[in-house]
């Protein structure tokens, strides 16, 4: 497993813990199908939340959210549709992005976490 995959797994675990502290329930992590992958799927009161986690060393070059372009959003929507066809729910779907800025991609320096709810609007 490469370094970026390890860092990505660390970022997703950190994001899941962040969501739990905000009283979300994690339903799935690393859901994948032939259309793509969704980092986290969680519930928040009336929403089934599909979460894209972006881990960066800093926001100096570009904000992590800028890496979730229209093409990536479309891929996430299609993947979420597949998940919903396999796991029907009465909850409203929502797409969130969690940006994590960690200078060394570890817990040695406290990372900055930003949560954008309904990020694709």
PLM regions and their residue ranges:
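Residue-level signal for inorganic ion chemistry
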Residues: 19, 76, 95
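Short acidic/glycine-enriched loop/turn segments that link adjacent beta-strands
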Residues: 33-36
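Acidic-basic catalytic patches of nuclease active cores, encompassing PD-(D/E)XK
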Residues: 1-29
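Domain-level recognition of nuclease-like catalytic cores that cleave nucleotide substrates
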Residues: 86-121
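Conserved catalytic cores of phosphodiester-cleaving nucleases, focusing on short active-site segments
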Residues: 38-61, 76
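Secondary-structure boundary/capping motif
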Residues: 24, 29-30, 49-52, 114-118
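Mg2+/Mn2+-dependent nuclease catalytic core
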Residues: 57-81
């Amino acid at each position: 497993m490469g370094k970026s995959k390890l860092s990505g797994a660390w970022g997703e675990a950190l994001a899941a813990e962040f969501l739990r502290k905000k009283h979300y329930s994690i339903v799935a992590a690393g859901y994948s199908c032939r259309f793509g992958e969704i980092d986290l799927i969680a519930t928040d009161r009336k929403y089934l939340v599909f979460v894209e986690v972006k881990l960066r060393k800093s926001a100096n070059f570009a904000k992590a959210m800028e890496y979730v372009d229209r093409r990536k959003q479309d891929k996430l929507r299609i993947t979420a549709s597949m998940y919903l066809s396999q796991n029907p729910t009465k909850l409203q779907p929502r797409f969130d992005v969690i940006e994590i800025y960690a200078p060394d991609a570890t817990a040695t320096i406290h990372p900055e976490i930003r949560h954008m709810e309904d990020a694709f609007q």
